[in-house]
Amino acid sequence: MGLLDLCEEVFGTADLYRVLGVRREASDGEVRRGYHKVSLQVHPDRVGEGDKEDATRRFQILGKVYSVLSDREQRAVYDEQGTVDEDSPVLTQDRDWEAYWRLLFKKISLEDIQAFEKTYKGSEEELADIKQAYLDFKGDMDQIMESVLCVQYTEEPRIRNIIQQAIDAGEVPSYNAFVKESKQKMNARKRRAQEEAKEAEMSRKELGLDEGVDSLKAAIQSRQKDRQKEMDNFLAQMEAKYCKSSKGGGKKSALKKEKK
């Protein structure tokens, strides 16, 4: 099965730009950031053992998508003909996609995360991101809450209020998925979030961590490799925003609009 067919099967679209959530005219930097953002959602280290095989497959396909769009010649062929050269070295080479990902994206520190969160919440950037997520997912709060950075389930009323104000101001359309969301769906989302919070708290206790940054870093450094990976993933969730250049392309266009 070719790359485009795989994308259709796994991501619901054969459009490589839609897979990365970027516009067709996206700069190289925007393509890279799009790859980073989507890859954080499907990275094998972020799922349980039962879902690891599927996540690995998605991650590998995503890496190939980025390889095509980050290669000038391959991207030109795709843009002009809508096809992908399946025999090109870009797609045929045997690559360790996780190692490749680590080379592309550096880690950041816990202090960086805390500093970012402090300035991000309540900022114009967060406001724009929330409205963009609302548009991207056509008002689906499940996906909005998962995609917006630094958001806890307890903040849903705040997020909903921001969106409602944007609707009232005519800045975004009124989607039924948002304004007519059932209480059953809201409660299911709350239960999932509470279960995840409990699991996170149990993991924190297993690691013997208190609330201090220094003790957290010291404990992580002394633990086994698999536990270090878990923290790396937590840190990586912030890289796309924190490391984003202030120059160039601005916000990505909403292209994940095929599924309603």
From Swiss-Prot:
Its main location: nucleus. Keywords: Cell membrane, Chaperone, Cytoplasm, Membrane, Nucleus, Phosphoprotein. One of its GO terms (molecular function) is heat shock protein binding. Induction: By heat shock, bacterial lipopolysaccharides (LPS), phorbol 12-myristate 13-acetate (PMA), and the cytokine TNF (at protein level). SMART domains: DnaJ. Expressed in heart, placenta, liver, skeletal muscle, kidney, pancreas, thymus, ovary, colon and peripheral blood. GO terms for biological process: nucleosome assembly; positive regulation of ATP-dependent activity. Residues 185-208 are annotated as: Disordered. PROSITE patterns: DNAJ_1 (PS00636), DNAJ_2 (PS50076). Residues 15-82 form the J domain. One of its GO terms (cellular component) is nucleoplasm. Disulfide bonds: none annotated. It comes from the Eukaryota. SUPFAM superfamilies: Chaperone J-domain. The functional J domain is required for the release from histone-dependent chromatin-binding. Acts as a dual histone chaperone and heat shock co-chaperone. As a histone chaperone, forms a co-chaperone complex with MCM2 and histone H3-H4 heterodimers; and may thereby assist MCM2 in histone H3-H4 heterodimer recognition and facilitate the assembly of histones into nucleosomes. May also act as a histone co-chaperone together with TONSL. May recruit histone chaperones ASF1A, NASP and SPT2 to histone H3-H4 heterodimers. Also plays a role as co-chaperone of the HSP70 family of molecular chaperone proteins, such as HSPA1A, HSPA1B and HSPA8. Forms a co-chaperone complex with MCM2 and histone H3.3-H4 heterodimers. Within the complex, interacts (via C-terminus) with MCM2 (via N-terminus); the interaction is histone-dependent. Within the complex, interacts (via C-terminus) with histone H3.3-H4 heterodimers; the interaction is direct. Interacts with histones H4, H3.3, H3.2 and H3.1, but not with CENPA or the testis-specific histone H3.1t. Interacts (via J domain) with HSPA1A, HSPA1B and HSPA8. May interact with TONSL; the interaction seems to be histone-dependent. This is DnaJ homolog subfamily C member 9. The gene is DNAJC9.
